[in-house]
Amino acid sequence: HISNGLERVGGDLNAFTTKQETVYHATVLRPDFGRAADLLTDIVFHSTYPQHEITREVEVICDEIESYADSPAEIIFDEFESMLFEGQSLGRDILGRAERLRGYTTADALRYVRRHYRTDNAVFFVYGNVDFGLVERTMRRLTMGIGAENAGSIGENAVGLPVADAGD
């Protein structure tokens, strides 16, 4: 399993999706920052999306779609958002339609990732007592040459904030 590399050192790996973002996150101790950054960038930018995994995940999503269909509150909220944000991405159902999902392929996933998962369209957020210079160097190295003309230019928009003491 892909998260074993972090779980072996007491870390945690997870992800979630909203209408505006997909978030991949890891929690690790400071010495394992490099391992977590490497794993997250590998997952985000280098996943291969084998068809059998897509098929399995599509069924999970289709089950979620069915459970939402049994929830009047969810249906009302989705309808409200669709009217409020008509013609915009925020007005679309985040889960999609089961009949369309069942035809989803590896090629579809890779096409989506190439279009949307680029370093110029990503935010790397690190908090904790980790040296900012180390974060910059690590992220620059891990994103060099990935899907954007500015790949590796992480420091351009990066902001380092002072580490607060526990007593602050």
Outline where the language-model segments fall.
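Charge-rich, well-structured scaffold segments of protease-associated domains
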Residues: 2-162
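Short, intrinsically disordered, charge-balanced linker/junction segments flanking boundaries
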Residues: 164-168
